[in-house]
Amino acid sequence: MHLVAIRRAIYEKNPWIASSLYSASVESKRIARARLRYAGSLAAMLPWLQDEIEEIDEVFGGDPFAYGIEPNRPTLEALVRYMHEQHFIPEALPIEKLFVPLPGAAGT
């Protein structure tokens, strides 16, 4: 899992930046997953890659790297809890306070 952060000052001057980064990430993931599935030649030197992709689709419902708060809530809450317990952050904020709203984004 990766998390992209935008400095508040940059976001406040350029509020479009969050949705642009999200859209670029969604498109990048779509292209990468399509390339993995292309059977003309393998994207990686794993002869069982197609079987692995099918199993991943079965187990994760088609997307092992879902975007948005809701599909990642347990992981995000654990991250905030651990950071607070280990004194990296002064208080454990609600997850919604950590992300800007992205209208139309999946899982938000």
Q: Where in the sequence are the language-model features?
A:
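Secondary-structure end/capping motifs
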Residues: 5, 10-85
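Long, low-complexity C-terminal extensions of enzymes
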Residues: 68-108
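Glycine/small-residue-rich pyrophosphate-binding loop that anchors the diphosphate of NDP-sugar donors
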Residues: 2
